[in-house]
Curated annotation (Swiss-Prot):
It holds the Pfam family Exonuc_VII_S. It catalyses: Exonucleolytic cleavage in either 5'- to 3'- or 3'- to 5'-direction to yield nucleoside 5'-phosphates. GO terms for biological process: DNA catabolic process. It comes from Symbiobacterium thermophilum (strain DSM 24528 / JCM 14929 / IAM 14863 / T). The gene is xseB. It is found in: Cytoplasm. This is Exodeoxyribonuclease 7 small subunit. Its main location: cytoplasm. Its EC number is 3.1.11.6. It is an enzyme of class 3 (hydrolase). It comes from the Bacteria.
């Protein structure tokens, strides 16, 4: 299911998972399930960002031969 989420949906769900984990009122098994889901969501978001970065670099390369530099947020 994670693979079907947009970046925004995955981040929103990840924030919910973090809030639930931070509440501290969870049985161990539920906490482990949420942790596992959070890791999967974080990996999904990273993969989506990596793809977006590659697309940006390709566009820069194609539109005028501009030197491609890795995207580095401020």
């Amino acid at each position: 299911m994670t693979q079907e989420l947009s970046f925004e949906e995955a981040i929103q769900r990840l924030e919910q998972v973090v809030r639930e984990l931070e509440s501290g009122d969870l049985p161990l098994e539920r906490g482990l399930e949420l942790f596992q889901e959070g890791v999967a969501l974080a990996r999904h978001c990273t993969a989506l960002l990596d793809r977006a970065e590659a697309r940006i670099e390709q566009l820069l390369e194609r539109d005028g031969g501009v030197e491609t530099l890795p995207f580095e947020p401020e």
